Amino acid sequence: MAGGATAPAGAKPKQPKQKQKKPSSQARKKPSQKQKAMKPVKQELRKVEKQVRVLKARTNGPKVNDTMKTTVTVGTLVGQTQSGLNRQLRVSFNPLLMKSTEGGSTTPLSIRASMYEMWKPLSVEIFATPLSGFSSVVGSVGFMVITLNGLEASADSIDTIKARRHVQMALGRPYRLKLSARELAGPREGWWLVDTSEAPADAYGPAVDLMLAYATENLLGTSSGSTTSYTGTLWQVEMRVTYAFSTYNPKPGLQTLVSQSITGGQTVTIQPSPDDGSLIMTTNSQQVLALLTPRVAGQRKGKSQTIWAIAGSAVDAAATVLGPWGYLLKGGFWLVRLIFGGSSARNTTTRQYQIYPSVESALTDQPIFGNSTGTQSVTVPICHITEVVNPNAESNNLPPPTTGAQPQPQPPAPIEEILLPLAELTGQPGVPPLYTFDGSSYTPPTNWLGSTILLTGIPAHKRVTGNLAKFGVTNLQMSKVAATALEIYDFTDFGVFFGTGSYLSEGGIHTGKTLIYSLMSGQTPNPWLAANQSGTTWYMPSWAGFPQPGQGDYFLQMQDVTDTTTHTTSVNVYFLVAYRQSRRLIAFFNTGGTARPAPTSMLCLYNVDCGRAPQTPYPTFQSTLQSLNQIGVDAKSDPDSDDDISLAGSVIGDEFDSVDHLEREREDLMRRLRDLDLRRFQI
């Protein structure tokens, strides 16, 4: 084609590209508010789902195999006569030991727990239900306190309690303490071991301390301006718990670990061991021995494998013997193991126990050492004993149930009572300080007359001196004096009381320890006087070394039996004080001047109504001796002696005798009865 090249066949001419029009702002759709709100929610949901997947893939301890929800009653809080802070119960959260205070009994919770290797609490609620009113019982305040280390001994005070998780309880009102699983988590990914013998520190777990502060008073017993102590129940404590268990491993012996409270005042002696000087606890309390005696006989040397925890009221009396370890008794918590061999093996009524401050020390046998000399007897009003370590988890040596024939009844085993030496006697329930005994009951006096009690013995003595200070008692008849020295006599261990005057026929009525037990157990105190009674004020120098008598203490004015003068000032008289807190019987004597010489014979004192003249007749020191024919009358001289007819011959004889023989015996007895009747009519 002329004038230019021809275009390729089939080619399309280029056309300009048309630009797409963007939608205008009016045409663009705005997202709704609902869509905007859903976007962050979906993002958060995806984030949570991712976290859940990560947590599922992570291993947090063993898997939960079983759970149990139940309610357990763990005990009661009772009123107290002491004025300090006292621990009455320490309850472990270990399900084997969370039980009512009834010794080695099983509970549904302990049975379930003994079947597994590990436990952890999912939820815990502690309820205190009041058992007394708030209008008539006053003076005390209760505490529920959480202790993360249940096997730790510490000297607690109200300030240290309030620094921990606690609930303060006013009398007569219900309270609740709720705990979460996080607060009670164990050391093994939140789990605790069940068997306390494997690793007690990893098994015992946290504990709740049930405490009471200050003395409890009963306003209904108010008389003459003074109130009486209340020692009844204040609260019942129960725990509503949910437990998780893991790793099935049944151990039947763990079902019956002991957890029991003992009341009534248990006396123990703290002293250095004669073998190595370590501190040991000695007791002859039958209740304590029954709990702490090993179940399996055979061990003769060393120390028992079973470890016991003792939680009780705070005791200050033994601090001098314990030395730097005095906080154990002040805190009211320590651990013991029975000592075999030596004097403990020779004496079946008294046992010795090694004292430890912690379970780790008990497991490795690391005892404590206090002062090298000295012995101190202390009385724990309330103590709670727990079996911490039982070496045999398969058996607790309890008698197995039987399905065969009923066993033959066994006669009761005789119980050996401690009668000698007298210093070992600790008290007998129901016996007042002064009494007449008719063979079956004890009758206290109804007045406060003097010349009714004699006190003798070989007391421990010391003379203390100091700056001029007030000493004595002031009431309507007696007045205080200024003193620079005091003679102090301790009759606790070796004092003996005799009745005199109208009580002369009673003979020996008390030892020092049994008298203290009688006064502190709520018996009629006559002729003893309350130290805080209305109109009476006590003065005791600070250098005397003993507290000023007060609430719960009792006293008597006493004089030498050779002194029949009337004293109205606190000079040349004995003030015999029975201290409730320390359980000691102390006599204070003020000579008013020079030191008193050592006695050349045993002291012998008689009681005088404080500030009054001695009661007449004065004490006598012998009674009338009866002749033999007055003591034992010959049976032949008594016409009615045949009244005592024994039927033993008619019921105990040869089982092969005939019936005729029994009939003849019966006729013979009837004939003797008729003869006796005729003889009475003739008389």
Swiss-Prot record:
The Pro residues compositionally biased stretches are: 398-413
Gene3D superfamilies tied to this protein: 2.60.120.20
User: Which InterPro entries does the record associate with it?
Assistant: Astro_capsid_N (IPR004337), Viral_coat (IPR029053)
Keyword Cell membrane part of the UniProt annotation: no
Question: Which cell locations does it reside in?
Answer: Virion
Gene Ontology annotations of biological process type? symbiont-mediated suppression of host complement activation
Keyword NAD recorded: no
Q: Among the entry's GO cellular component annotations, what is one?
A: T=1 icosahedral viral capsid
The UniProt similarity line reads: Belongs to the astroviridae capsid polyprotein family.
| Protein name (Swiss-Prot/TrEMBL) | Capsid polyprotein VP90
